[in-house]
Amino acid sequence: MPKRDAPWLMAGTSKVSRSGNYSPSGGMGSKSNKANAWVNRPMYRKPRIYRMYKSPDVPKGCEGPCKVQSYEQRHDISHVGKVMCISDITRGNGITHRVGKRFCVKSVYILGKIWMDENIMLKNHTNSVIFWLVRDRRPYGTPMDFGQVFNMFDNEPSTATVKNDFRDRYQVMHRFNAKVSGGQYASNDQALVRRFWKVNNHVVYNHQEAGKYENHTENALLLYMACTHASNPVYATLKIRIYVYDSITN
């Protein structure tokens, strides 16, 4: 039996009561209203650190709307490494295009998985895939290979650091790894990958419209990938999204 009578069951009238509150938050009570009021309180009622160090939604020198570019691809990652450019944006007027030469990549979102082939999965081994998000300050020609940029001890990607000659040009912004293991009994043939970074990387193109690495003039974003096992490769199915704002100076 209901605790209160419904409006259409009230005696003496067939009209629905207009005095009732039928808003979605009306039945939650005063506790929810107080919580919402506290979360959405004005800025002057928050601590000073919230007022001093609040990061803007739109990067400085840029304007909205926020544009999104996605890169969906299956990668064959080997011991010698692989590279892809994730700041390739074609010039145009769409929500996935850049208006002019300059734009800012505010954040990068990487999600997907790394996995092994069925034949490799049965072998007893452990394989780690390492990812480097690198900023190329002076891009030219084609992206340099993994072995050209990084210095390794005994050709081991886990010991990779940027060569001294390229420390001013290539800057490692983020680095992470994921691990898979094979075997007949206790195998972990898949590993999920999910990363979200704020980068605020200001990219500059030349006068060309095509979104290619060769058309970059400043601050290209590169993603390097390499696995630690010398003979067993790993596959990576990734979806990489970058969130972009156009520059005001275009």
UniProtKB/Swiss-Prot annotation:
Q: Does the keyword Transcription regulation apply?
A: no
Polar residues composition bias: which ranges?
Answer: 14-31
Give any Pfam family that matches: Gemini_coat
Where does this protein reside within or beyond the cell? Virion; Host nucleus
Renumbered ranges of motif Nuclear localization signal: 34-48
GO molecular function terms here? DNA binding; structural molecule activity; zinc ion binding
Q: Keywords for this entry? A: Capsid protein, DNA-binding, Host nucleus, Host-virus interaction, Metal-binding, T=1 icosahedral capsid protein, Viral penetration into host nucleus, Virion, Virus entry into host cell, Zinc, Zinc-finger
Give the unnamed zinc finger regions: 53-70
What GO CC annotations are associated with the protein? host cell; host cell nucleus; T=1 icosahedral viral capsid
Which InterPro entries does this chain map to? Gem_coat_AR1, GV_A/BR1_coat, Viral_coat
Region Disordered: start and end of each range? Answer: 1-31
Which biological processes are named by the entry's GO terms? Answer: symbiont entry into host cell; viral penetration into host nucleus
The UniProt annotation puts motif Bipartite nuclear localization signal at 3-19, 194-241
Q: Where is this motif: Nuclear export signal?
A: 95-116
Q: Which family does it belong to?
A: Belongs to the geminiviridae capsid protein family.
- What does it do? Encapsidates the viral DNA into characteristic twinned ('geminate') particles. Binds the genomic viral ssDNA and shuttles it into and out of the cell nucleus. The CP of bipartite geminiviruses is not required for cell-to-cell or systemic movement.
Q: How does it assemble?
A: Homomultimer. Binds to single-stranded and double-stranded viral DNA. Interacts (via nuclear localization signals) with host importin alpha-1a.
This chain belongs to the protein called Capsid protein
